[in-house]
Amino acid sequence: MEQGQDTPWTQSTEHTNIQKRGSGQQTQRLEHPNSTRLMDHYLRIMSPVGMHKQIVYWKQWLSLKNPTQGSLKTRVLKRWKLFNKQEWIN
């Protein structure tokens, strides 16, 4: 990939403005996102219930030890299906 060429990923994260609602502080920019900063971003914009679910998801994702892309995809899909079933039951 050529240097300076934005991918959809970098466009959606590096240039995302985070507005702190009601605090009067200036907006922050995610210049070099990593797992922790992305998690922080999601926690700021989510409801308390959604926030708890996202924390659980991120802790599980970050706890994986050297996952291959295939095993990660399988694990995430299983969690997503289970999560959706629970949402419909509740």
Swiss-Prot record:
Site label Low pathogenicity, positions: N66
The keyword Protein biosynthesis is assigned to this record: no
Protein known as: Protein PB1-F2
Function: Plays an important role in promoting lung pathology in both primary viral infection and secondary bacterial infection. Promotes alteration of mitochondrial morphology, dissipation of mitochondrial membrane potential, and cell death. Alternatively, inhibits the production of interferon in the infected cell at the level of host mitochondrial antiviral signaling MAVS. Its level of expression differs greatly depending on which cell type is infected, in a manner that is independent of the levels of expression of other viral proteins. Monocytic cells are more affected than epithelial cells.
Region of interest called Disordered, as start-end residue ranges on this chain: 1-34
Originating species: Influenza A virus (strain A/Chicken/Hong Kong/YU562/2001 H5N1 genotype B)
Domain of life, source organism: Viruses
Location within or outside the cell: Host mitochondrion inner membrane; Host nucleus; Host cytoplasm, Host cytosol
Keywords linked to the UniProt accession: Apoptosis, Host cytoplasm, Host membrane, Host mitochondrion, Host mitochondrion inner membrane, Host nucleus, Host-virus interaction, Inhibition of host innate immune response by virus, Inhibition of host MAVS by virus, Inhibition of host RLR pathway by virus, Membrane, Modulation of host cell apoptosis by virus, Viral immunoevasion
GO CC annotation: host cell cytosol; host cell mitochondrial inner membrane; host cell nucleus; membrane
Coiled coil: none
GO BP terms, alphabetized: symbiont-mediated perturbation of host apoptosis; symbiont-mediated suppression of host cytoplasmic pattern recognition receptor signaling pathway via inhibition of MAVS activity
Keyword presence, Membrane: yes
Homology family: Belongs to the influenza viruses PB1-F2 family.
Note: Is not encoded in all strains, and seems to be dispensable for replication.
Polar residues: compositionally biased ranges: 1-28
Mitochondrial targeting sequence: annotated span: 65-87
